[in-house]
């Protein structure tokens, strides 16, 4: 066997072993990548998810097309489209990854809002201006971050991949 091919195969096996050990040892509050996704693919995957879920009704605690809440939609999107395991709740999702400014938003960044004294909301940035989320009034929709309501309630943005 060609030594270059053998060397690459050894690096892949070693890398997979390291990833497996790291995933088992990782704290539960971090996102765990099943496979990395390129940024250009993220936007396409998000639009695929949006098209499949568009209009799905909001249901607190929901995790299906019969009804889904905001953190459930984020959880399912990351799992099914991006191959990453995120925490299930908005609060726990808000504690993972790295903070980014709204001006630095990229497709796949999580955007968090404080919509009431003890109420949080989460969506996924499609770009610097729009995000997809499970809205209580409209179900799964794309909204503008330029909207006054979303600008006033924006709490933070986080990059988890």
Where are these regions (language model features)?
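Catalytic cysteine-centered active-site loop
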Residues: 56-107
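Bacterial Sec signal peptide processing site at the extreme N-terminus
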Residues: 18-42
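Sec-dependent bacterial lipoprotein signal peptides
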Residues: 1-24
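Stable alpha-helical elements in mature extracytoplasmic
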Residues: 42, 46-49, 69-70, 74
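...with weaker cross-activation on analogous glycine-rich loops/strands in unrelated enzymes
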Residues: 36, 85-147
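Recognition helices and adjacent regulatory flanks at domain boundaries
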Residues: 47-51, 57-58
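Glycine- and charge-enriched low-complexity intrinsically disordered segments
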Residues: 150-161
């Amino acid at each position: 066997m060609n030594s270059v091919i053998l060397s690459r195969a050894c690096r892949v096996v070693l890398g997979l072993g390291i990833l497996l050990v790291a995933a088992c040892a990782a704290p539960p509050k971090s996102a765990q990548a099943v496979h990395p996704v390129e940024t250009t693919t993220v936007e396409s995957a998000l639009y695929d998810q949006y098209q499949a879920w568009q209009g799905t009704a909001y249901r607190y605690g929901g995790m299906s097309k019969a009804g889904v809440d905001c953190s459930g939609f984020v959880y399912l999107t990351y799992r099914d489209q991006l191959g990453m395991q995120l925490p299930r709740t908005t609060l726990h999702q808000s504690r993972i990854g790295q903070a980014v400014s709204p001006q630095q938003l990229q497709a796949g960044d999580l955007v968090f809002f404080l919509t009431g004294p003890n109420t949080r909301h989460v969506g996924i940035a499609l770009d610097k201006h729009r995000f997809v989320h499970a809205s209580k009034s409209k179900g799964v929709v794309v909204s503008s971050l330029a909207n006054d309501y979303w600008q006033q309630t924006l709490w933070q943005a986080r990059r988890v991949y």
